[in-house]
């Protein structure tokens, strides 16, 4: 091996080591930003930069004010940043209204400080806000569904970065468990109904599901802590979603939110119950989360918790 080859190999190793030392929270923020940029450049799904500005400003201002009031200091605002982008992408109001972005942003962040058990919030903030909006104003608010299409190049970029970052943040097992559960359950549902299988599986490549599997069900602050129970809870969420879809197929009188976004509704129903049981069993009285590798060990717990988001979506 020549001197040039050795030098190139050392450079590659140095860059790899630097990448491994990057705080995972910045990787998550990068991924949601990538989703936003790709979605806007390719499909113009934002619908107006005033929506993005309003959601981001409201999320970050609410986080700053409530954290200062609750903890005496302004915490890291990365979680608010991720929530603001997720809301901008997912919320689709009628008539170009802006109020759902302001209200949704406030509800998302406020839920972290109000809906708590033993100093831990129970809902993924973005998930809570979107389902709350759909329940309160189903005729005024909808969610992003198929507006991206299933373009191979777009999905390849997002899924490649998403899977790599999920592996780096040590939540890949949750993402893959949900995807596998979704594929199996929806294939069985299609067979039972005598429908083609592929149309029932296609939604997993849509934008809402990409935000859901990379940011919401993997949120470190709202998932249960033991790995074996993480598998169990993710499967239960997928089962609940499948049951909501079956109920919708049968014409049961479900809330519009459950028909419009069964995955979000399933997490909204199952996630906080699982987290509450986890906290109650452990006797945890301080903010708890699934550990993320790479976070500085000396970082104050409050800052570290508020900065992390695994969820449109946080």
What is each of the regions a protein language model found here?
Residues 72-149:
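Membrane-interface helix-loop-helix junctions at boundaries between adjacent transmembrane segments
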Residues 43-58, 90-104, 140-156, 197-210:
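Structural signature of hydrophobic alpha-helical transmembrane segments
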Residues 8-31, 185-300, 310, 314:
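C-terminal transmembrane helix-loop-helix hairpin of multi-pass membrane proteins
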Residues 1-68:
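N-terminal signal-anchor module of multipass membrane proteins
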Residues 80-93, 127-141, 156-159, 179-190, ...:
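Small-residue-rich segments of transmembrane alpha-helices in multi-pass membrane proteins
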Residues 12-14, 60-72, 107-121, 160-170, ...:
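C-terminal ends of transmembrane helices
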Residues 42, 136-188, 194-195:
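Internal active-site segments that recognize and position negatively charged phosphoryl groups
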Residues 51-63, 79-88, 100, 104-108, ...:
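Alpha-helical transmembrane segments in multi-pass membrane proteins
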């Amino acid at each position: 091996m020549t001197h040039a080859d050795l030098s190139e190999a050392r450079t590659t190793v140095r860059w790899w080591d630097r990448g491994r030392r990057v705080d995972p929270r910045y990787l998550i923020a990068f991924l949601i930003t990538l989703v936003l940029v790709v979605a806007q450049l390719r499909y113009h799904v934002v619908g107006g930069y005033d929506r993005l500005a309003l959601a981001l400003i409201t999320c970050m201002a609410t986080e700053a004010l409530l954290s200062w009031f609750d903890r005496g200091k302004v915490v890291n605002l990365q979680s608010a940043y991720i929530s603001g982008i997720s809301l901008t992408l997912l919320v689709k109001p009628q008539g170009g209204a802006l109020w759902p972005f302001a209200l949704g942003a406030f509800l998302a962040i406020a839920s972290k400080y109000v809906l708590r058990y033993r100093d831990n919030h129970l809902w993924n903030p973005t998930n809570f806000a979107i389902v709350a909006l759909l329940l309160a104003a189903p005729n005024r608010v909808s969610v992003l569904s198929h507006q991206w299409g299933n373009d191979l190049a777009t999905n390849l970029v997002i899924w490649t970065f998403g899977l790599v970052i999920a592996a780096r943040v040590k939540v890949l097992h949750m993402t893959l468990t949900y995807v596998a559960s979704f594929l199996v359950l929806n294939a069985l549902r299609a067979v039972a109904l005598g429908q083609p299988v592929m149309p029932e599986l296609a939604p997993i490549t849509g934008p809402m599901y990409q935000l859901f599997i990379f940011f919401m069900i993997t949120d470190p602050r709202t998932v249960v802590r033991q790995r074996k129970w993480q598998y169990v809870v993710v499967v239960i969420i997928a089962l609940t979603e499948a049951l909501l879809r079956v109920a919708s197929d049968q014409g049961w009188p479900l809330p519009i939110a459950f028909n419009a976004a069964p995955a979000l509704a399933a997490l909204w129903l199952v996630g906080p119950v699982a987290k509450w049981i986890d906290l109650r069993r452990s006797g945890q009285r301080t903010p708890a989360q699934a550990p993320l590798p790479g976070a500085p060990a000396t970082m104050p717990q409050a800052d570290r918790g508020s900065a992390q988001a695994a969820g449109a979506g946080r």
